[in-house]
Amino acid sequence: MPRNEKKTGQSASPRKLRVGELVRHAVAEILSQGGVHDPVLETHLITVPEVRMSPDLKLATVYVMPLGGKDEKPVLAALEQHKRFLRGEVARRVNLKYAPDLRFRIDERFAEAERIEKLLRTPAVQKDLSGEEET
């Protein structure tokens, strides 16, 4: 199930998706331009694949992944440390009534995709995919 769908199967509103994309672009731009002066963040390239907004648009869950998947905990700690600065920068770049509070999470989709790829490359699955039957 995609992250933007509720457990009831309803999809996210277009406004939540649009605001999430605006916040994602703002955070990615701030991080790529070196707007945060932190030794950990300055030495890592960080991707921001998704931002999920709460229904009232006051909370943004920002999914991040350091390039290569290394040093996730120090990067997450540095982002949490500079959360207030990032919130202010997002407020300046995105025109909203309230600046959303930022919550940072590591994006697990890359690890999950790698796990599925490894599973698909196993001999048992390859045998099933090639159409060979065991008798």
UniProtKB/Swiss-Prot annotation:
It is found in: Cytoplasm. GO terms for biological process: maturation of SSU-rRNA. Keywords: Cytoplasm, Ribosome biogenesis. Signal peptide: none annotated. GO terms for molecular function: ribosomal small subunit binding. The keyword Cytoplasm applies. GO terms for cellular component: cytosol. Gene3D superfamilies: 3.30.300.20. InterPro entries: KH_dom-like_a/b (IPR015946), RbfA (IPR000238), RbfA_dom_sf (IPR023799), Ribosome-bd_factorA_CS (IPR020053). Its main location: cytoplasm. It comes from the Bacteria. PROSITE patterns: RBFA. Pfam families: RBFA. Monomer. Binds 30S ribosomal subunits, but not 50S ribosomal subunits or 70S ribosomes. One of several proteins that assist in the late maturation steps of the functional core of the 30S ribosomal subunit. Associates with free 30S ribosomal subunits (but not with 30S subunits that are part of 70S ribosomes or polysomes). Required for efficient processing of 16S rRNA. May interact with the 5'-terminal helix region of 16S rRNA. Belongs to the RbfA family. This is Ribosome-binding factor A. It comes from Rhodopseudomonas palustris (strain HaA2). The lineage of its organism: Bacteria, Pseudomonadati, Pseudomonadota, Alphaproteobacteria, Hyphomicrobiales. The gene is rbfA.
